Amino acid sequence: MGNRRLAREHALQTLYYADTGKTQGKDINEYKEDFKDSLDAAGFEFCSGIIDGALEHQAELDKIISAYAKNWSLNRMSVVDRSILRMAAYEMLFSPENTPVAAVIDEAIELAKKFSTENSSRFINGLLDQIKKERKNGQN
């Protein structure tokens, strides 16, 4: 498994715990330390950037996701799907990494297939594709 994919998996797990409030008294930085040994320095920095960025921009990301989630409120989405969407939207719109948008969407789909449902992967793909098109048209 690639270092960035593993970094995204760790970021997803951390954002999931943060969203559910099941942090067991740990703060986010303690969660990051838990998986530091499984990533190289670049992977750890990438993962930390996604976590910190998605949390910092969460209100704005939620507005964007809600605008494209036809007939779906954020509260109705599974926590896993919501976390994947926040991560991917953060990477597409705010991350200084400049990861190609197609790669971000592909990684989000793979995370959904692994941690959620097949229907979720299609939903996530469609929503992120809409964000990509709007971004390309300069509307985001």
UniProtKB/Swiss-Prot annotation:
Signal peptide residue numbers: none
Alphabetized Pfam families for the sequence: NusB
Record keywords: RNA-binding, Transcription, Transcription antitermination, Transcription regulation
Keyword Transcription regulation belongs to the record: yes
InterPro entries xrefs: NusB-like_sf, NusB_fam, NusB_RsmB_TIM44
GO biological process, alphabetically ordered: DNA-templated transcription termination; transcription antitermination
Entry keyword annotation includes Magnesium: no
Domain of life: Bacteria
GO function terms (MF aspect): RNA binding
GO cellular component: cytosol
Family of the protein in this entry: Belongs to the NusB family.
Stated role: Involved in transcription antitermination. Required for transcription of ribosomal RNA (rRNA) genes. Binds specifically to the boxA antiterminator sequence of the ribosomal RNA (rrn) operons.
Protein name listed in UniProt: Transcription antitermination protein NusB
Organism, scientific name: Elusimicrobium minutum (strain Pei191)
Designated gene of the protein: nusB
